[in-house]
Curated annotation (Swiss-Prot):
One Gene Ontology biological process: thyroid hormone generation
Disulfide-bond pairs as recorded: 136-177, 170-210, 269-318
Active site feature: 139, 276, 296
The keyword Transit peptide appears for this protein: no
Native species: Macaca mulatta (Rhesus macaque)
Positions annotated as glycosylated: 103
SUPFAM superfamilies assigned to the protein according to its UniProt record, in alphabetical order: Cysteine proteinases
Pfam families for this protein: Inhibitor_I29 (PF08246), Peptidase_C1 (PF00112)
Name this protein carries in UniProt: Cathepsin K
Length: 329
């Protein structure tokens, strides 16, 4: 009985003594995430959103403890934002209207032999630290750079931070902080004959004029390959054989915004509504749940140190295999 009381506390606190506890919690949250507001009105409206999110998190975690969900949520630095605002300000996948796959760029998996049961490129030293795109729709640039970094390590043995800002400023087919697409980025690096390192061309989180300098060049690209649409088995092969792969997902749900640990699976995730680009750096299984290991670009304070485990072989959950691609180096 005591166990149930503990479980119900977070939900009950809203009903029993909301104000004092919430006041303290709110002040602590603001301090932790260095939040400042322009006016009292602004702060009140943000606090209402934060309270709604906190309640959502508490109820979800209560359900998770009763076995309803395979993942848990936690309050984070996005606490005073609605899920619509997160999509608007912190995603940025823009698929070209004319996008059609050609046989020239289609990845044809080598089905010989078995793919390993699990792969984690973080352990192999293929993955740079988690970055934060800020309030710029540049997810596509971070996803592209992550895939290029993996191939650079594979080819040269060197792990190096490449420049998403180079892509934000210089890929004319994309729209900078207004959004873009990964294969456009790979094509730019190919035509440009290179991409600068992060040190040579640091990230500023807004679109500026193109300042690419060949002296800062750290990697090249010979083109790209696209995974057959919606084919998770082909995506698994690509991750196992090639390295980290750029993928697009639906990141529009509140459950994604506050993901903390476990294997993320939300039936409301829409595989036809892809809005965010991330990086698949491996796959595996946790407590019987197959998953993809996904690197996000919302900083280390988001998710599990910047990562999320997303359901694998669950009918292409969140559309993870719909727009997957990787660069050739």
């Amino acid at each position: 009985m005591w166990g149930l009381k503990v479980l119900l506390l977070p939900v009950m606190s809203f009903a029993l003594y909301p104000e004092e506890i919430l006041d303290t919690h709110w002040e602590l949250w603001k301090k932790t995430h260095r939040k400042q507001y322009n006016s009292k009105v602004d702060e009140i409206s943000r606090r209402l959103i934060w309270e709604k999110n906190l309640k959502y998190i508490s109820i979800h975690n209560l359900e998770a403890s009763l076995g309803v969900h395979t993942y848990e949520l936690a309050m984070n630095h996005l606490g005073d934002m609605t899920n619509e605002e997160v999509v608007q300000k912190m995603t940025g996948l823009k698929v070209p209207a004319s996008h059609s796959r050609s046989n020239d760029t289609l990845y044809i998996p080598d089905w010989e032999g078995r793919a390993p049961d699990s792969v984690d490129y973080r352990k192999k030293g293929y993955v740079t630290p988690v970055k934060n795109q800020g309030q710029c729709g540049s997810c596509w640039a971070f996803s592209s750079v992550g895939a290029l970094e993996g191939q650079l390590k594979k080819k040269t043995g060197k792990l190096l931070n490449l420049s998403p800002q180079n892509l934000v400023d210089c890929v004319s087919e994309n729209d900078g902080c207004g959004g873009g697409y990964m294969t456009n980025a790979f094509q730019y690096v190919q035509k440009n004959r290179g991409i600068d390192s992060e040190d040579a061309y640091p990230y500023v989180g807004q679109e500026e004029s193109c300042m690419y300098n060949p002296t800062g060049k750290a990697a090249k690209c010979r083109g790209y390959r696209e995974i057959p649409e919606g084919n998770e088995k082909a995506l698994k092969r690509a991750v196992a054989r090639v390295g980290p792969v750029s993928v697009a997902i639906d990141a529009s749900l509140t459950s994604f915004q506050f993901y903390s640990k476990g294997v993320y699976y939300d039936e409301s995730c829409n595989s036809d509504n892809l809005n965010h680009a991330v990086l698949a750096v491996g796959y595996g299984i946790q407590k019987g749940n197959k998953h993809w290991i996904i690197k996000n670009s919302w900083g280390e304070n988001w998710g599990n140190k910047g990562y999320i485990l997303m359901a694998r072989n669950k009918n292409n959950a969140c559309g993870i295999a719909n727009l997957a691609s990787f660069p050739k180096m």
